[in-house]
């Protein structure tokens, strides 16, 4: 399991220009099952994605598809973690 923290490196006006394409990127990876949660930070300095993938290399490949990454307007911090406890609806993601 991975937490991907995005931090904008460009003004919000520039981020807005790529937002529709970024949302399509998110939709693609929700459909594939890789993304579980996402949302913007408050204050609006970036966003958070909770993802499920086989490896950090897979997450890095996925990030490479993000229009924010391709435009060079966000930095990404990837944190891998092993879920030990979950809400009942998320039990499939816990490592036993």
Report each predicted region and the residues it spans.
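Conserved, structured core segments of small domains
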Residues: 1-96
């Amino acid at each position: 399991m991975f937490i991907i923290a995005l931090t904008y490196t460009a003004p919000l006006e520039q981020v807005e220009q790529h937002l529709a394409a970024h949302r399509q990127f998110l939709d693609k990876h929700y459909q594939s099952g890789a993304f579980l949660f996402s949302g913007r930070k408050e204050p609006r300095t970036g966003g958070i994605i909770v993802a499920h993938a086989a490896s950090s290399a897979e997450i890095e490949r996925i990030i490479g598809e993000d229009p924010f990454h391709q435009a060079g307007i966000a930095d990404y911090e990837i944190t891998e973690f092993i879920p030990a406890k979950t809400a009942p609806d998320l039990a499939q993601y816990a490592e036993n």
